Amino acid sequence: MASSRETWSLTQHLLSSQEQLYKSATQHPFLLAGAEGRLPKDILSRWLANDRLYIHSYIRAAGQLLASIDLPKQVPRSQEAFETQLADWIIEALVAIRKEERFFIDVAERYNLGIEIGLPFPPAAAAAQDVPREEKLPGLIQMESIFSAVGNPSRTSSDSSSKVPGVALVQSLFTTTAAGPSPTTNLPWLEGALTFWGTERCYLDAWSWARAKAEERRSSGEQAEENDADGGALRKEFIPNWSSSEFAHFVDKLGKLIDDAVAGVLEGKEGEAKEQTKQDILGRVEGKWRTLLEAERQFWPDV
């Protein structure tokens, strides 16, 4: 019999709540094609170009979440406040994602891949210009809308439009009231933190699945990466980077922070009061979780 003191995990609850949708977001045919060396350079280039724009939205959202965090005024006596830990994680994420963009550029140059939307292969020079909406993947448009509301619920994406199915729903889910969360809301940063954890966890699991498929192919003695349709960019460079133990530790660190913070809110509550608090938290995040998974699923190009 489970102990009555067993800690409830919000992140594990979310992962198990939408299993089929999560699977479709992390085990897509695009990933399998990449793992098997069948992904053409033009399709990989399109995805990389969109993922680079995702990085830019991620950076803006991280800044918004940092600005919204109310850091403690008192010096901690033991463990640092969850808000301080979250700020540390976001700062670490910003450093990592800038390194990631430089990695994109380096690999794209070495494998002759395009990382600018509308430009299939690296040009000698290109002037900065606005990206045509129709060239963005549906998942990127949804993620830009999701990120626009992080840490600032009254804000909606200036790029939103009824032309793209689901964007209005995304904005309504990730936008609460014009005044933002109530000052008495438990963990007012929770939705923003879960957005970052959710997108990073999907990325980790997606590329870890691709790595497992690539290893199956390698163990069967099939062709070397140099003969892959993308020249080996995914199997030699990207897949190992995005399925590393270091990346897994980084993602797990935020998941643990979230679960520990929620456990702190539930601590001392029993019976109906504890269950009501759980339901209040789930009411804030479950719809957003599903919407995030839909965006992640639609971020992969058709192959």
Question: What residue spans do the PLM features occupy?
Answer:
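Active-site-proximal alpha-helical scaffolds that flank and shape metal-associated catalytic sites
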Residues: 80-250, 294
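Acidic, low-complexity proline/glycine-rich segments
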Residues: 2-31, 246-253
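Amphipathic, well-ordered alpha-helical segments in soluble domains
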Residues: 26, 54-61, 100-103, 169, ...
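Extended, basic/helix-rich recognition subdomains
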Residues: 235, 239-281
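Short alpha-helical hairpin
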Residues: 15-39, 263-272
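Alpha-helical bundle segments that constitute or directly flank the non-heme di-iron/ferroxidase center
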Residues: 19-24, 39-69, 96, 194-205
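A cross-kingdom marker for long, charged
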Residues: 264-272, 277, 283-303
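Helix-loop segments that flank and shape redox-cofactor active sites
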Residues: 29-42, 59-88, 185, 216
